[in-house]
Design a protein with these regions (language model features):
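P-loop NTPase catalytic nucleotide-binding module
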Residues: 2-4, 13, 17-18, 81-193
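P-loop NTPase switch module centered on the Walker A-proximal segment
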Residues: 1-68, 72-81, 178
Length: 193
């Protein structure tokens, strides 16, 4: 299920009763009710003058056949993973399949605010599963053991999470300036290769 700019989008069935009517369900409502989508969902939108079509597919192994059909028509895949490095192996079948199919892909770390390990540890755990070098575009900002925002290495900006609202732009914390510079340089080097 997706939202666009916080607005709900239409999905093809309501999770609770498996009805087949077209309904509008917000992602937050779906999550709060403990439901999750079990079928491929489609949506499209325009952004900065370009038209995009998205295929949302469940990640469970029981949905692999539907996922394979969706991947065969994809220009790019976004693999959503758990932030725990110990669970990185769950992404291996999908990452290997994407490499074998030649589908460009990016990894999105879900629930980063609940991460127990570091991004470097997660990338180290994932790297053997990918032909291409894995590069972090964002690094988390930690305050008192909690992740409160992130530094975007491409934009050279920091953001603070605000529950229920878009993240706020903040100054890059002084304790992260050296790491930001080193990680940004590494990211650019890897992209150049």
């Amino acid at each position: 299920a997706f939202t666009l700019g916080g607005n709900p989008i239409k999905i093809f069935s309501k999770i609770e009763n498996s009805s087949s009517t077209l309904q509008t369900v917000s992602f937050s409502t779906l999550v709060l009710n403990g439901g999750s989508s079990t079928e491929i969902n489609l949506m499209h939108f325009d952004y900065l003058g370009d038209h995009f079509a998205l295929i949302d597919m469940p990640g469970g192994t029981g949905f692999a056949a539907d996922g394979l059909a969706a991947l065969q028509s994809a220009d790019m895949a976004l693999v959503v993973i758990d932030p725990d490095p110990a669970r990185a192996g769950l992404a291996e079948p999908m990452l290997r399949r994407l490499d074998a199919m030649g589908v460009p892909h990016a990894i999105f770390v879900n629930k980063i605010d609940q991460a127990k390990g570091g991004i470097r540890n997660l990338l180290e755990a994932l790297q053997p599963m990918s032909k291409a070098p894995l590069i972090a575009r964002q690094i988390p900002i930690r305050e008192g053991g909690a992740i409160t925002g992130f530094v975007d290495l491409a934009l050279e900006r920091a953001f603070h999470y605000v529950p229920g609202k878009p993240s706020e732009v903040i100054d890059i914390p002084t304790d992260l300036t050296e790491r930001e510079a080193a990680d940004r340089f590494h990211m650019l080097e890897q992209l150049a290769d």
